[in-house]
Amino acid sequence: MNINKIKKNNFFKEKKILKIHLIGIAGSGMSGIALILFNLGYKISGSDLLENFMTKKLKNMGINIYFQHSEENIKYADFIIISSAIPSDNPEIKAAKKKNIPILLRAEMLQIFMQFKFGIAVSGTHGKTTTTSMIFDILNQNKLDPTVINGGLIKSINSHAKLGFSKYFIAEADESDGSFLCLNPTTAIITNIEPDHIDNYNGEFKLLKKTFLDFLNKIPSYGIAILCTDNKAILNILPKIKCKVITYGFNKSAEFRITSYKQSDFISNFTLIRKKQLNNLEIILNLPGEHNALNATAAIAFATYQKIPDEKIYQSLKNFKGTSRRFEYVGKLFIKKKSIQNKSVMLINDYGHHPTELSETIKTIRKSWPKKNLIMIFQPHRYTRTRNLYFDFIKILSQVDSLLILNVYSANESFISGADSFSLYSDIKKIKKNVILVTNRNLILNYLLPHLNGNDIILIQGAGDIDTIINKIFILKNKKVII
């Protein structure tokens, strides 16, 4: 089968005789594609250097996964799907080219799925994973049986992906390398646009904005774009968008406007004014933070557009279980320290790795728990991001009470002098005293204990492998975390 036939193939209906190999199968998007294809009946294999929750799940389902890259792995493949993170000199890619085995990008495979469905693509610099999860939960809990492939684990199904049998296909659309231009959705949600992954856009923010505009202008005339008009970059491209647009935000001009926002602990509530609806909507959301109110409003706008009853929207968001590593409450850390008796601290795990995301998380914690001592354990993600947003990081990271900085998670990038953790540590140290460079993560407790006073929140922050600290250093027992 050549690549053009593959791209026209209806994988939901055709005979399931193809053997498909995924290089980089451990990634959230790639593992989701593997799960969907396997559940459709195709013979799936994959390779990666990393073993994680999803690879274990896929192996238990019966998918053959190799934890090394070798040309032997692709011997029987009819075609190959690759993650954009896989370099061109990968031995499996080189072997596939030599044997003329068709190679598809992850986003190209998403489009193959999407072309036979009502495609819903969620993109933006921040919030797309949570928004995708919310849209899925609203549809799924109301028996609309969507298919979803998300960038994070949806807690209600304990998976990144699920095969449904309705017309709806929801996908998180990755803007980081422009590959979302492969998609042709019926509906697109853009949460925000900020300078990130800017090296993939020749260092030009205007090129990133233009790429988002090009993506939105692929929506057909009968489709719709749902956009957050609190974001300046979205406002900038808004007049050039050709399809129907629904706007949302705190902005007074938004069609779906958030008012009367309040939060307490892990719950937020707000009133949603819908200018084209007869009634306002009172929302209780099982997540704190104004940014999550925005994510929920994007999902509400879509659900309203799909004529889902208000009560069902309300109940879905009230019962929303969240997404793994997105402001995720892990448990309590009970302190064994002579100066502190019978005290425990909260442990929160968050994937945010951009200064704006860090700022929103800090603001959310300060609003719900203003008197808590906030300790952040932060792992910078990518040298290029650290370099490009260096002074923003210094400003935001200086706002926590105590900061522990791990080494940069490189994501296969080369070292950049002045964009490393020591540089961040040195410059933040000029502003605040309570900052520590963690050179040995196995000794994290030794670094952490002096900063605890018994009234603390420990925030584990970053997109790399920082979450393994929870599993390797803290012991989970009876839903509580103990030293």
Curated annotation (Swiss-Prot):
It is found in: Cytoplasm. GO terms for biological process: cell division; cell wall organization; peptidoglycan biosynthetic process; regulation of cell shape. GO terms for molecular function: ATP binding; UDP-N-acetylmuramate-L-alanine ligase activity. SUPFAM superfamilies: MurCD N-terminal domain, MurD-like peptide ligases, catalytic domain, MurD-like peptide ligases, peptide-binding domain. One of its GO terms (cellular component) is cytoplasm. HAMAP family: MurC. NCBIfam families: murC. PANTHER family: UDP-N-ACETYLMURAMATE--L-ALANINE LIGASE, UDP-N-ACETYLMURAMATE--L-ALANINE LIGASE-RELATED. Cell wall formation. This is UDP-N-acetylmuramate--L-alanine ligase. It comes from Buchnera aphidicola subsp. Schizaphis graminum (strain Sg). The gene is murC.
